[in-house]
Amino acid sequence: MNSAFRILYECDQYRLYSIYENVYLKNIHRSESDNDIIVASVYGDPDSGLISFGNDYVAIAGCGITIHFLNGDEGYEIGTEADNVFWTEGIYQSGEDDFKYVRFTAYTDV
């Protein structure tokens, strides 16, 4: 196995994993790797990631925050622009949260 391969999150239907800076989503009920989709490229490698409780979106921490919607809607990135970078880590979703919220720790060296 590739030493750069990291599983960021896994649920009943999906596995979120990275190889270096690229983050992929795999439907674990399909064996073919060509069905894996790239959901983000994170400068400096991703720190952590999650798949929302309802399997609606993927959230990735590292250089900023990346949100990728699984229904095909356009995702977005926050804090990834060269003039506005912030570093995030430890992204998670609490059982006490509404399904649309995630929590993370942010650090910016100014």
Task: Locate each region found by the language model.
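Repeated scaffold domains used in trafficking and secretory/extracellular systems
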Residues: M1-Y14, Y20, I37-N55, T80-F99, ...
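Small/flexible residues
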Residues: L8, Y17, I28-E32
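Extracytoplasmic/lumenal domain signature
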Residues: Y14, E32, R103-V110
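Structural motif
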Residues: I19-N27, C63-N71, T108-V110
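Short coil turn/linker residues within repeat-based beta-strand modules
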Residues: R30-S33, G72-G75
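A short local loop/turn or secondary-structure capping micro-motif enriched for an aromatic residue
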Residues: I67-F69, Y76-E77, N84-F86
